Amino acid sequence: MSRSIKKGPFVDAHLIKKVDAAVAGKDKKPIKTWSRRSTVLPEFIGLTIAVHNGRQHVPIYINENMVGHKLGEFALTRTFKGHAADKKSKR
């Protein structure tokens, strides 16, 4: 179920503070955040946000196609290495 339009997008307050400071200071350093649940806003375009995936911070460059999505969608949490090969079929 999607979020109600009248509520507006959710963004953590501490992330908005960091983004405003980066935009005002023309800072190019990645903004570190653990807030995977925050929605990407148009103010984020052109910034690099390092989103935590449970193990490390994954740097993500925000472009206009990402607006409206959640930050967690771009930092994958699971790594799939493939299923084990069947030893009988290799013979």
From Swiss-Prot:
GO terms for molecular function: rRNA binding; structural constituent of ribosome. InterPro entries: Ribosomal_uS19, Ribosomal_uS19_bac-type, Ribosomal_uS19_CS, Ribosomal_uS19_SF. It holds the Pfam family Ribosomal_S19. GO terms for biological process: ribosomal small subunit assembly; translation. GO terms for cellular component: cytoplasm; small ribosomal subunit. It comes from Bordetella pertussis (strain Tohama I / ATCC BAA-589 / NCTC 13251). NCBIfam families: rpsS_bact. Belongs to the universal ribosomal protein uS19 family. Protein S19 forms a complex with S13 that binds strongly to the 16S ribosomal RNA. This is Small ribosomal subunit protein uS19. PROSITE patterns: RIBOSOMAL_S19. Keywords: Ribonucleoprotein, Ribosomal protein, RNA-binding, rRNA-binding.
